[in-house]
């Protein structure tokens, strides 16, 4: 087999042994190499080969078409699997690994779409990647750099690999939050670490928030459309879509500031969609729009970018802007303003994919750099023409569409003047079908049960008609489909519902004009022709929609004789040739979660409502509402019987609430609570037993019935319960189905916090299975708001694990008698909690008092430190608590909101079960955070009332003598109380 090497492989200490081993693997002699399969690794098929007595080589197998290759990943020195990057904390017992032959291992090889015929250097993100010659040249090109490439050209993977070589503070920013999150996960996949780099992966909105968090919510197209309908009477001659593009892409997008009315009126013919005589009305609409935004709690990112320009400071050593065509000029200028050194950037995108209203052009982007001649001379542009996503026939169809676009409108710019080259190797299928009931019925029957087939329409308002014919929940407009890909795509009435626009697009284009294999740069014949700007959306939307299909594309049209189809060489098919895989409930669960993460809540909800059809669990859940109801019934109303008391006692055991058990004993006369310390472990285990089992089909069946995020009786999700139980296999199964790592209980604790508490209490749990759990369930980052701006704490920062530790232990500061009176944290407390954690979770240099004290001190409020995140407040010397002014972003499905940190941790509920000496400290923390004070805990109400009555009787028994000043004052108080009571009764 062919030998490949990971670009980061270091064999310098074992050169001779390595060469001998490679020779054996090259001739498929796994026995000589002593190859064994690592059986308990969940992320891929990994093997180890013996270099010598102490050292091992980690590798995997990949297959390209019929060629089998061994990819050398990492040298494991001295059997130290715990420090392996690629094993990510998995515990390896060499006595349990099994020998394997080359043929058996080859059957499990990972398939790759492309492999360079000569080069053996392989990059690794979430999978092995081999660069073609164009990608390799860009990889070695210094900045500044602009990379132009079609969908599936590998732009993102290439930019991430280039980013790995940059030191300092770096930024990756793109319009889509999902793409930013996915890029971050790809970047750190395989355990990648960069000690001298701090990387931020942000959507553009999050980038804006990192400067200052705007008030309200971003205004979307749907918001504008609804508002525009109410203005239509005054603006009958304006089209909503064109008006939105003009406001977003022209008036509000200028780098020098929002265009004045006169400046807008003076724009050239090609600089605006609208004719000069229409611009007065359009500017009137813009002024109304600008006034409407704050009235409804909305904001426009362009207008915010204009305002925030004065706040942006030079911060980043390097910036990557992905999908740059989705940004306006002012948005891009704001990003580049945060560079410390001009020119340290990489921009990548494809102007043929523009479906957002922004009036983008590469020439406009480059004009930002021409203001600095030295930078303009250095700036280089490279084009990636290969497409590794789409089938050959789809790529050919997309190329024909690009030829039509160029013939009709001329070249958009020099940078976008290229055709794509299919590199995926799939032949694929494209069919044109008539919009008749028989054809749509057949397509619907084949697609409705598959997660690999989606229906696309041009605009949001077209989806309702498509849903009359297709029952799949996967119906998207083009704006929504950006960034998606499915094996089969159905385009519904793209052309038929817009006959005139597409007729105008193909006007004057002949079949002979499309015979060229390349695009020659040429400008439009008429410089005053604005057709491209008017019709750009339609042709780009069709291009984007086509390229969402990985293998099969079906165009369903009423007008199958439209001249566009003749130019595309599409002939009518009588029957759809489509084969789809019928998805399981597990497949639909994963699809729903993926769409939620991408912000496609409409389609995710449709999956849950029409396919998954989850029902609420039949058991009562002790969430905060249920808990407070039980407290009221037991302690305030004193309802007879032990049922509610037993529920509260079980709750105390599961959530470690010793004071609640004490209240049940003393205030509710529940005698079993006296043995709380002895019974707690067994009672808590009762609720975890189903989640500890090796066979957990019943748990997965419950998830099918009630949803992945249903709650147990103790208000845990299945993922939380599995993590606390330490069941790695169940956690993997739930994560694979799309379980939400961020879901939290009524104390703001997620699955990671539950597992942390188990690891802190049990050294065996900390050593195994916690390292594997941590890799699976730790959220990628935590978003906090400090001094009005977003601060993202990534999982690779020291502050991340410290914050998660304090979050998990927060409640115990107030509820356990062995804690100090400050209700805060010191380094000794944290180090004690971490004492059993392996280096794969907390690196050895971070698990030291000096380092920990430094992290706490440098993140203290008002500390003069450049990267101070102001996470903590010092209570007294050496004792810290969360900064009370801190806010945290709490996510619920597709919604997110900022909450004060003490509210997110639910300090008011903690107050109900806190030690009595902790109550004043809780009140002071709440006051510092600007939160309301708490009433007397429900369990203590009767005792406090008794104490007050006793105090009153004591006071009355020592009444002052009649005639003394004290007696007169007392009588005046009584008289005033009677007057107040009388007035209250009269009102």
Model region roles, listed by residue range:
Residues 128, 144-169, 175-216, 278, ...:
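Conserved helicase motor core of SF1/SF2 NTP-dependent helicases
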């Amino acid at each position: 087999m062919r030998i490949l090497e990971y670009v980061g492989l270091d064999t310098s200490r074992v050169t001779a042994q390595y060469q001998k081993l490679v020779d054996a693997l090259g001739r498929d002699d796994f026995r000589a190499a002593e190859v064994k399969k690592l059986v308990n690794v969940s992320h891929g098929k990994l093997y180890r080969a013996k270099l010598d007595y102490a050292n091992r080589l980690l590798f995997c197998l990949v297959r390209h078409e019929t060629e089998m290759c061994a990819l050398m990943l990492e040298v494991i020195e001295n059997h130290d699997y715990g420090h392996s990057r690629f094993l990510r904390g998995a515990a390896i017992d060499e006595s349990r690994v099994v020998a394997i032959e080359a043929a058996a291992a080859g059957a499990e090889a990972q398939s790759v779409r492309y492999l360079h015929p000569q080069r053996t250097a392989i990059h690794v993100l979430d999978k092995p990647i081999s660069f073609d010659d164009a990608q390799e040249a860009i990889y070695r090109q210094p900045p500044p750099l602009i990379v132009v490439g079609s969908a599936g050209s590998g732009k993102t993977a290439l930019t991430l690999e280039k980013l790995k070589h940059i030191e300092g503070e770096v930024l990756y920013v793109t319009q889509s939050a999902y793409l930013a999150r996915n890029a971050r996960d790809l970047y750190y996949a395989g355990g990648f670490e960069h000690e001298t780099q701090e990387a931020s992966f942000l959507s553009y909105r999050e980038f804006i928030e990192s400067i200052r968090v705007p008030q309200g919510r971003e205004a979307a197209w749907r918001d504008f459309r609804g508002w525009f309908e109410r203005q239509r009477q005054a603006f009958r001659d304006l089209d909503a879509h064109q008006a939105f593009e003009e406001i977003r892409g022209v008036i509000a997008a200028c780098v020098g500031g929002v265009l004045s009315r006169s400046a807008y009126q003076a724009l050239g013919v090609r600089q605006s969609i609208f004719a000069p005589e229409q611009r007065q009305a359009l500017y009137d609409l813009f002024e109304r729009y600008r006034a409407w935004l704050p009235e409804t709690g909305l904001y426009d990112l362009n207008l915010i970018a204009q305002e925030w320009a004065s706040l942006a400071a030079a911060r980043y050593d390097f910036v990557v802007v992905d999908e740059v065509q989705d940004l306006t000029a002012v948005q891009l200028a704001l990003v580049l303003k945060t560079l410390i050194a001009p020119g340290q950037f990489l921009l990548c995108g494809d102007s043929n994919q523009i479906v957002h209203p922004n009036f983008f052009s590469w020439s406009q982007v480059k004009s930002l750099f021409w203001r600095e001649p030295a930078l303009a001379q250095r700036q280089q542009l490279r084009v990636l023409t290969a497409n590794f996503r789409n089938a050959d026939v789809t790529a050919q169809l997309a190329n024909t569409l690009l030829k039509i676009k160029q013939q009709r409108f001329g070249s958009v710019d020099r940078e976008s003047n290229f055709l794509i080259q299919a590199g995926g190797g799939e032949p694929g299928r494209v069919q044109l079908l008539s919009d008749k009931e028989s054809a749509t019925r057949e397509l619907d029957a084949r697609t409705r049960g598959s997660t690999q087939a989606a229906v696309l329409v041009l605009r949001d308002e077209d989806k309702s008609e498509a849903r009359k014919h297709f029952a799949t929940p996967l119906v998207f407009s083009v704006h929504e489909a950006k960034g998606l890909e499915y094996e089969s795509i159905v385009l519904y009435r793209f052309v038929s519902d817009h006959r005139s626009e597409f007729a105008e697009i193909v006007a004057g284009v002949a079949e002979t004009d499309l015979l060229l294999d390349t695009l020659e740069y040429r400008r439009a014949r008429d410089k005053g022709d604005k057709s491209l700007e008017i019709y750009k959306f339609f042709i780009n939307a069709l291009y984007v929609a086509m390229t969402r299909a990985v293998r099969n594309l079906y165009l369903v049209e009423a007008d199958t004789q439209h001249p566009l189809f003749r130019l595309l060489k599409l002939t009518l098919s009588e029957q759809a040739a489509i084969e789809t895989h019928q998805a399981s409930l597990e497949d639909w669960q994963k699809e729903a979660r993926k769409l939620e993460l991408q912000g496609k809540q409409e389609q995710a909800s449709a999956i849950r409502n029409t396919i998954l059809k989850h029902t609420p669990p039949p058991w009562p859940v002790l969430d905060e509402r249920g808990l407070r109801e039980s407290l009221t019934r037991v302690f305030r109303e004193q309802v007879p019987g032990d049922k509610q008391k037993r529920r509260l006692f079980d709750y105390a055991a599961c959530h470690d609430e010793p004071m609640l058990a004490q209240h049940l004993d003393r205030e509710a006369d529940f005698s079993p609570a006296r043995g709380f310390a002895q019974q707690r472990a067994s009672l808590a285990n009762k609720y975890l037993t189903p989640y500890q089992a090796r066979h957990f089909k019943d748990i997965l069946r419950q998830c099918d019935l009630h949803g992945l995020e249903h709650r147990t009786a103790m208000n845990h999700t299945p993922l939380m319960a599995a993590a606390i139980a330490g069941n790695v296999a169940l956690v993997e199964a739930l994560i694979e189905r799309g379980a939400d790592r961020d879901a939290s209980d009524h104390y703001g604790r997620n699955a990671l916090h539950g597992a942390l508490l188990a690891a802190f209490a049990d050294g065996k749990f900390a050593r195994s299975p916690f390292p594997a759990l941590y890799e699976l369930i730790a959220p990628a980052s935590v978003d906090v708001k400090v001094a009005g701006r977003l601060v993202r704490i990534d999982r690779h920062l020291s502050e991340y694990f410290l914050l998660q530790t304090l979050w998990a232990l927060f409640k115990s500061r107030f509820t356990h008698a062995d804690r100090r009176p400050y209700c805060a944290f010191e380094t000794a407390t944290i180090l004690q909690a971490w004492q059993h954690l392996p280096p794969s979770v907390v690196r050895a240099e971070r698990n030291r008092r000096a380092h920990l004290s430094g992290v706490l001190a440098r993140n203290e409020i008002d500390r003069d430190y450049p990267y101070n995140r102001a996470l903590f407040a010092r209570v007294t010397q050496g004792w810290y608590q969360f900064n009370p002014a801190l806010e945290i972003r709490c996510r619920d499905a597709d919604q997110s909101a900022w909450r004060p940190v003490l509210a997110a941790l639910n300090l008011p509920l903690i107050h109900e079960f806190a030690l009595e000496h902790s109550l004043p400290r809780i009140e002071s923390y709440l006051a510092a955070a600007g939160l309301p004070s708490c009433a007397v805990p429900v369990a203590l109400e009767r005792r406090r009332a008794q104490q007050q009555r006793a105090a009153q009787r004591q006071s009355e028994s020592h009444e002052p003598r009649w005639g003394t000043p004290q007696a007169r004052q007392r009588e005046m108080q009584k008289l005033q109380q009677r007057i107040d009571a009388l007035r209250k009764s009269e009102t």
